[in-house]
Design a protein with these regions (language model features):
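Glycine/tryptophan-enriched, flexible segments
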Residues: 41-195, 304, 308-369
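Weak global preference for isoleucine
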Residues: 4, 10, 19, 28, ...
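Short, low-complexity intrinsically disordered segments
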Residues: 28-31, 90, 98, 199, ...
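Generic detector of short, locally flexible boundary/turn motifs and exposed helical patches
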Residues: 11-13, 77, 87, 103-106, ...
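Trp/Phe/Arg-rich N-terminal binding region typifying the photolyase-homology
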Residues: 1-61, 163, 226, 272, ...
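Short, isolated positions within intrinsically disordered regulatory regions of eukaryotic proteins
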Residues: 6, 28, 34-37, 50, ...
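Intrinsically disordered, low-complexity boundary segments flanking structured domains
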Residues: 9-10, 30-35, 56, 98, ...
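Active-site-proximal binding-pocket segments
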Residues: 128, 132-322
Length: 369
């Protein structure tokens, strides 16, 4: 909404100077005010939003061909991008640049490789953090290096199967997030479900810092948080695991997680980030039910079966056998000794008991009913 107001101010400023202004939608497949229910109200559930609202509406425009000629606007302004000093004075971002190549050309190349290799098993493969069945195009999409129209039609032209349909439905979730933000401008700070305003969140700075640093003692959580810190990105499966752990096992307000992701993600997107955190907390639109609490141990066993993801980001656990990799606190001492692991020293003890904290969360959420 604030961007709409900004654009209106720019248009008004230029109109006063007899400059014709035209604006075009290049960030979304559908404008958020276009997709609404028959009674004119916004959708609150994704499936009807996407299937009835989006897919029954005018199809998104196909990508335009590259212009053969650009008419350069002549201006007396002489500032360059470097003059704006957008980069930090202390170049902490250099380590992130090992994981990303900026620009449209690389985005197009990444998308082509995804269509050739990743999309064939996208529906199932996208759940495995160590595999490469996701496009990892979200930063390029966020910064406008690719448009959602290019992704939509690029996938559609690749053929028709359940994997392509599922990929397009994920773009639909992005549209749903923007619809929520458009209709709820305070999405990043205010519960969509007002009953959560009285939820008994716990303020625990020590646990919050441990979560941010990937030092919770729960390997699947720590791997996700370290991936975020080291690369500026986190696999979506991991986002759900670390989010559930924060708001349900630790009972820390979802807004703390939203702010941390906003500060650290290369693809930090106000609509997606806010809606995603409200979804995992259970207070958003079409949210996960309160009793859905991700068990990071079983999630690791199922979606990182060979332990590659955890071992990549938690090298201190590299020698721990798979049986105990996701729950090292259950390993016999001789197993930990052989793996050069000493809990509390080389790797933290868990900051919460998963079973006890789960029961505590269920009790807290039930109090809202």
């Amino acid at each position: 909404p604030w961007r709409i107001k900004r654009d209106e101010k720019i248009k008004a400023y230029l109109a006063k100077r007899n400059i014709e202004v035209k604006s075009f939608n290049n960030a979304l497949l559908w404008e958020p005010w276009e997709i609404k229910k028959d009674d004119g109200s916004p959708y609150k559930v994704f499936t009807p939003f996407f299937r009835k609202g989006c897919l029954n509406y005018t199809p998104p425009r196909e990508p335009l061909d590259s212009p053969k000629k650009l008419n350069i606007f002549q201006s007396s302004l002489s500032k360059s991008i470097d003059d704006l000093k957008l980069l930090p004075s202390v170049r902490w971002d250099k380590s992130l640049m090992q994981h990303w190549i900026i620009g449209e050309a690389h985005a197009q190349d990444r998308f082509s490789k995804f269509l050739a290799i990743g999309i064939g098993n996208y529906k199932e493969g996208r759940n495995y953090p160590s595999d490469h069945f996701v496009s990892r195009l979200s930063p390029h999409l966020h910064f406008g290096e690719m448009s959602p129209n290019q992704l939509w039609y690029g996938a559609k032209h690749a053929g028709e199967n359940k994997n392509i349909d599922h990929f397009c439905s994920e773009l639909g979730w992005r549209e749903f997030s923007y619809s929520q933000l458009y209709n709820n401008p305070n999405l990043s700070t205010r519960n969509l479900q007002s009953k959560f305003d009285s939820f008994p969140w716990i303020k625990n700075e020590t646990n919050l810092i441990a979560w941010k640093r990937g030092l919770t003692g729960v390997p699947m959580v720590d791997a996700g948080m370290r991936e975020l810190w080291q690369t500026g990105y986190m696999h979506n499966r991991s986002r759900m695991i670390v989010g559930s752990f924060l708001v349900k096992n630790l009972l820390i307000d979802w807004r703390e997680g939203e702010r941390w992701f906003w500060d650290t993600l290369c693809d930090a997107d106000l609509a997606n980030n806010s809606a995603g955190w409200q979804w995992i907390a259970g207070c958003g639109a079409d949210a996960a039910p309160y009793f859905r609490i991700f068990n990071p141990v079983t999630q690791g066993e199922k979606f990182d079966p060979d332990g590659k993801y955890v071992r990549t980001y938690i090298p201190e656990l590299a020698k721990v056998p798979n049986k105990y990799l996701f729950c090292p606190w259950e390993a016999p001492k001789e197993i930990l000794d052989a793996a050069d692991v000493k809990l509390g020293e080389t790797y933290p003890e868990p900051i919460v008991d998963l079973k006890i904290s789960r029961e505590r969360a269920l009790s807290a959420f039930k109090s809202l009913s």
